UniProtKB/Swiss-Prot annotation:
GO terms for cellular component: cytosol; ribonucleoprotein complex. This is Elongation factor 2. Residues 19-260 form the tr-type G domain. GO terms for molecular function: GTP binding; GTPase activity; translation elongation factor activity. GTP binds at residues 28-35, 94-98, 148-151.
């Protein structure tokens, strides 16, 4: 502990010097070596012994991570590195590479200004590399590149020196292509990666060595010498001459921006408030004396301290006892402790100034994504957009009935810690549902509930999450209130694909200027008249008021929207969420007396009209899809392809490199159960594979009724698909 305490003192000494701070994330595809790299950097900072680096997996402190050999959470740590005679503070977050935990990567990218992208020299850029790079660039985070496992290329693939240079060059070119296609403006402004200037390092995290061009000039050790060291099994000697932490940390300090530099531009990406307001100016300048602006990116429950909220402080200074406002919460929360993270350990410090990553307790009303400020009127930060959506659900029940109240509380707490997890608690049926990113995600959450929260649970086999939508138009459909005094006429049709994309990307919200919102909708393909009459949207569904001059409508609109929301939260086909529909209110007849047009009259009338309208508009069920990427030797290709095609998969592309083939396919999530074992046996265990969320697509027509029947039976509903008249009973 003495050693850590000393490092903590050096960290605190640098906190007030934002020009000497680097907030960075380490991102990569699964198993490309992020956590092993993190260990090396920590060993270089004196936090763990060099011998244990790569074996200790300091950042994978959860027993589940160590048992599975993967990173599940984003762990953060602060350390000190000396560069050109000055000390620098590096706040580092190690992120997961498995697609099921991509939400952790997205949230970590909000807290950092730079990212070290780790790529396996042998496998090259993989699908998840592309995903994490896109997340970084979307958040205005600058990348540098570490090409890992160079020793594998030399010793396993036995490539010649010339071939090695070509292959390494290809890895850099591929990453540059991705950066250019995603963010050309920054690419041209100097974000292009170039081995010659030192924004790329090469090495082996497992054997603790790395080189970069600036370091080659200092040490005289270049690729030829590295090749010889690896071939003659003298990598231990190489790690003493070219320690990994020097090459990588030097690259971080030279190329990744300090908070002072980064916040000038990043604030405009992640915050849409008034830049000339006191908080806007303070954040742009990273001013420790300005109003507090803190964004929560992670919440973890500490058994002793309670909820610990970790996040990035963009302006102001956090001090114990401070009363702060949380976006969307009417009362203030008081900070109880302020600290920094050292992996699993939280070290308390007196105060934390702007530009740092802080871990605080006392913000009991905060959730991931909350804006915390000393200014009650601060515009909140942009919401954190997750790349994937939940695609699988499990039903959870307590083994002992006496644990039921505790289970409900634990599930609420778990949803707070992990926003990519959707928890629905049906108070009527007593069924608790957890929807997550995949089998592994749900399995890990269930294990943690039992281990950390002490609740014995039973889970059902995973069920796929479906969506409901329409392919045709219907209406006007008349919805009558129970007292027959109010009538609503609603048309239903599919929402334009361009508008759906705009909604998914979060490009519009109801707080925007109407003119700006209308312009974006028209550009996305919406009719001018309809764009003017848009009243609200929920998810990717939109409600329009096409009526003119109807008395009492304005004061009833809130109830109408409530009815619309109820109808699309649980659609008519099988009570699954609705997506991609447009509901148009074309006529209304309202009772003049407000008593006769209250919630009990308006909400069911609108809900039934929307539900019946969906059933009349050629309804369809959408199923979640995944891209599947498989790298396999040519002689095993047949086994892999028949496995894909036998599961309703479609092969999109095939690329050959050497004797390896990369297959890109698209498959329904419903067919992915047991895929890991099947692909292993189909290719004699020689396939490398990964997946990525590919959105929702209509289920084949010949499977629709069967699937609907199964879902309805499982939910305890009448098995037959309902008809419009079921919802329009007089």
């Amino acid at each position: 502990m003495g050693k850590r305490k000393k490092i903590a003192e050096r960290v605190v000494a640098l906190m007030d010097k934002p020009e000497r701070i680097r907030n960075i994330g380490i991102v990569a595809h699964i198993d490309h070596g992020k956590t092993t790299l993190s260990d090396n950097l920590l060993a270089g900072a004196g936090m763990i012994s060099m011998e244990l680096a790569g074996k200790q997996l300091f950042m994978d402190f959860d027993p589940l991570e160590q048992a599975r050999g993967i990173t599940i959470d984003a762990a953060n740590v602060s350390m000190v590195h000396e560069y050109e005679g000055k000390e620098y503070l590096i706040n580092m977050i190690d992120t997961p590479g498995h697609v099921d935990f991509g939400g952790d990567v997205t949230r970590a990218m909000r807290a950092v200004d730079g990212a070290v992208v780790v790529v396996d020299a042998v496998e090259g850029a993989m699908p998840q590399t592309e995903t994490v790079l896109r997340q970084a660039l979307r958040e205005g985070v600058r990348p540098v590149l570490f090409v890992n496992k160079v020793d594998r290329m030399i010793n396993e693939l036995k490539v010649e020196k010339k071939e090695m240079a070509i292959r390494l060059g290809r890895v850099i070119d591929n990453i540059n292509k991705l950066i250019r296609s995603m963010d050309e403006e920054h690419y041209k402004a100097g974000w292009r990666l170039d081995a010659a200037n030192g924004s790329v390092a090469f090495g082996s995290a497992l054997y603790n060595w790395a080189i970069s061009v600036p370091q080659m000039k200092r040490t005289g050790i270049g690729f030829d010498q590295v090749y010889d060291y690896c071939r003659s099994d003298r990598m231990k000697e190489l790690s003493q001459k070219c320690p990994l932490y020097v090459a990588v940390n030097d690259m971080i300090i030279r190329f990744l921006p300090s908070p002072l530099e980064a916040q000038k531009n990043r604030i405009r990406v992640i915050w849409k408030g008034d830049w000339n307001s006191p908080v806007g100016k303070a954040m742009t300048a990273c001013d420790p004396n300005g109003p507090v602006a803190f964004m929560v990116t992670k919440i973890k429950v500490d058994p002793h301290a309670g909820e610990v909220a970790t996040g990035r402080l963009f302006s102001g200074t956090l001090v114990r006892g401070m009363e702060l406002h949380i976006s969307g919460v009417p009362h203030t929360n008081r900070i109880q402790q302020t600290g920094i993270m050292m992996g699993a350990e939280r070290i308390e410090v007196e105060r934390i100034p702007a530009g740092n990553i802080a871990a605080v307790t006392g913000l009991r009303d905060a959730i991931v994504g909350s804006t915390v400020s000393s200014d009650p009127n601060m515009t909140p930060f942009e919401i954190i957009k997750h790349v994937s959506e939940p695609v699988m659900t499990v039903a959870v029940e307590a083994k002992n009935m006496r644990d039921l109240p505790k289970l409900i509380e634990v599930l609420r707490q778990t949803a707070k810690e992990d926003p990519t997890l959707q928890i629905t608690i049906n108070e009527e049926t007593g069924e608790h549902l957890m929807a997550g990113m995949g089998e592994l995600h749900l399995e890990i959450v269930a294990t943690r509930i039992q281990r950390d929260k002490g609740v014995e649970i039973k889970t059902s086999p995973p069920i796929v999450v479906y969506r409901e939508s329409v392919t045709g138009k219907s209406g006007p459909v008349e919805g009558k209130s129970p007292n027959h005094h109010n009538r609503f006429y609603i048309e239903i049709e599919p929402l334009e694909p361009g508008v759906i994309e705009v909604l998914k990307d979060g490009k519009i919200d109801m707080k925007m200027e109407e003119v700006e919102r209308r312009k974006i909708l028209i550009e996305a393909g919406m009719d001018k008249e309809e764009a003017r009459n848009m009243v609200n949207f929920v998810g990717t569904n939109m409600f329009l008021n096409m009526t003119k001059g109807i008395q009492y409508l304005r004061e009833t609109m809130e109830l109408i929207l409530e009815g619309f929301e109820e109808a699309i939260t649980a659609g008519p086909i099988c009570r699954e969420p609705v997506q991609g529909i447009k509901a148009k209110l074309v006529d209304v007849k309202l009772h003049e007396d407000a008593v006769h047009r209250g919630p009990a009259q308006v909400i069911p009338a609108v809900r039934q009209a929307v539900q019946a309208g969906i059933l009349m508009a050629n309804p369809t069920l959408l199923e979640p899809m995944q891209y599947v990427f498989i790298q396999v030797p040519q002689d095993q290709m047949g086994g892999a392809m028949s496995e894909i095609q036998g599961r309703r998969g479609v092969i999109l592309s095939m690329e050959t490199e050497g004797d390896m083939i990369t297959i890109k396919a698209k498959m329904p999530v419903a067919e992915m159960f047991g895929f890991a074992g099947a692909i292993r046996s189909a290719t004699e265990g020689r396939a490398l594979w990964s997946t990525e969320f590919a959105g929702f697509e209509p289920i084949p027509a010949n499977m629709m009724l069967d699937t609907v029947r199964q879902i309805r039976t499982r939910k305890g509903l009448k098995p037959e698909m309902p008809t419009p008249s079921d919802y329009l009973k007089a």
